[in-house]
């Protein structure tokens, strides 16, 4: 019976990982299509019911018209145009509720059956906490764009994205821990330190990627390897308030995002070259190699995103690949630290 329950838990974790990944992808498309402010209220239970009649649609559209995004940016929007952006935000919110149900019901069942180890239970409770506040963070983010300035705060967007990727990484770590019986090796202290540095770089790359999306900083330069006519762009350090320039100067944000990407490639190459032959666990070697390959793919995709002036489909692919890098690198670190 316990073996069957263990298989069900693994399947449950895999299902959760797929849905959360889909949630992140839809969230990225919601941002890229500028659909995030189409739903101007937040209803936990009633919010899952979509508009059915024409009267429902007109009511929602009229509500949307009361806010600055319509009045300043979309004053010529038709009802059909509103429907397009509405469905993206609606789908994103419904997926959030589905994730909640898919998590909480099996979690209660498996907890009552005492199917988790003590360490697993701590991680699952952490997931419950993170998931519970993620919805509130999402609404906190949306509210930032319902004010006088009809733009979602790029800082709140980054917080929302990071929380989602941390949730996905913990799920993936638990899945690996349960399915891969041979423990991951921590070759040396330098191995741990280098991978910690790599994770920090990836963490800030994701944050600055969210800043790029939130401020449309990717559209400020559509050239590579130069940024405009220079490798180091003009106005890089031009901001009125020095402290906040690193957070809201689109030129600096774009430049720093590129520097972080180049740095991540250099460090993962060093880690792979120096440590992969010393790893006995074949799955761990594949895990490490996958990170290396994805980082290289991400660089190529990122270049095409810039050259295309942030085409929506390429931007979405860029975010999804970045999510895979984050979850693989963080789950790798968790496995060498907590196995």
Regions picked out by a protein language model, each given a short descriptive name:
Residues 1-339:
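Polytopic transmembrane helical bundles with strong interfacial aromatic enrichment
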């Amino acid at each position: 019976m316990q073996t069957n329950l263990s298989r069900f838990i693994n399947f449950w974790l895999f299902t959760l990982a797929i849905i959360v990944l889909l949630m992140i992808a839809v969230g990225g498309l919601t941002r890229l299509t500028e659909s995030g402010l189409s739903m101007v209220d937040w209803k936990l239970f009633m919010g899952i019911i979509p508009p059915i009649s024409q009267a429902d649609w007109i009511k929602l559209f009229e509500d949307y018209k009361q806010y600055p995004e319509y009045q300043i940016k979309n004053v010529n929007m038709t009802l059909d145009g509103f429907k397009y952006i509405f469905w993206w935000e609606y789908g994103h919110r419904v997926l959030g509720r589905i994730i909640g149900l898919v998590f909480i019901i099996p979690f209660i069942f498996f907890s009552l059956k005492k199917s988790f180890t003590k360490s697993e239970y701590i991680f699952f409770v952490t997931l419950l906490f993170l998931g519970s506040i993620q919805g509130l963070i999402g609404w906190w983010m949306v509210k930032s764009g319902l004010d006088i300035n009809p733009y979602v705060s790029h800082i709140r967007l980054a917080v929302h994205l990071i929380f989602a990727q941390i949730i996905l990484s913990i799920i993936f770590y638990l899945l690996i821990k349960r399915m891969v019986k041979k423990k991951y090796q921590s070759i040396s202290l330098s191995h741990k330190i280098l991978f910690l540095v790599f994770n920090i770089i990836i963490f800030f790359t994701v944050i600055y990627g969210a800043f790029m999306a939130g401020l449309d900083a990717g559209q400020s330069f559509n050239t590579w390897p130069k940024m405009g006519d220079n490798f180091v762009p003009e106005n890089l350090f031009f901001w009125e308030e020095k402290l906040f320039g690193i957070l809201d100067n689109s030129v600096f944000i774009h430049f720093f995002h590129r520097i972080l990407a180049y740095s991540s490639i250099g460090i993962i190459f060093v880690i792979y070259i120096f440590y992969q032959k010393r790893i006995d666990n074949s799955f761990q070697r594949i895990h490490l190699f996958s990170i290396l390959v994805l980082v290289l793919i991400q660089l190529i995709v990122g270049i095409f995103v810039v050259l295309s002036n942030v085409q929506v489909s390429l931007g979405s692919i860029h975010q999804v690949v970045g999510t895979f890098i984050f979850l693989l690198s963080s789950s790798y670190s968790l496995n060498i630290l907590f196995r």
